[in-house]
Amino acid sequence: MSIVKNEPKYKNGLLQAIREQLEHRAYWLYLLCDEAGKRGLDWKEFGYPAIRRCGLEHGARHIKKGNTDSLKGLKKVLFTKPAQLVFEMDVLKSTDDELNIDFHYCPLVKAWQKAGCTDEEIATLCDIAMCGDHGIGEAYGAVLDLPKCIAKGDDICSLRYHKKK
């Protein structure tokens, strides 16, 4: 039996349509990793650097778009109201140097559940996907801590960005 609990509280049609788009992309990640694994490649070995690179590039774009490298700016350009609804987020703290957000639902995890991934595969895919968030944080001169993670059996994902001292 799976330890992963991931059911949305809000299920209106528009949210579901947006979530399905995110699920589709998460399914791509799973299929890429699955095919790579069949060829003897370790998912993490290529997934971590590729997705981190994506995060670094997106972080640089977000900084340019928001015209700031403050974590308040990151919240404004990435963790928008629509994103907050889709992932059922609670923004707990947002300052120039600290950003704390709890996610109560993850469409990526839902995609991997639908694909029949094991708990271990879901956790690994999440670790790979989160390299993007780590890369974004790095672009902002911040570190991301993830003390709780839906993909690992927790009830929420706790994203804790803080500027490097």
Where are the predicted features?
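N-terminal accessory segment detector
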Residues: 1-127, 143-157, 162-165
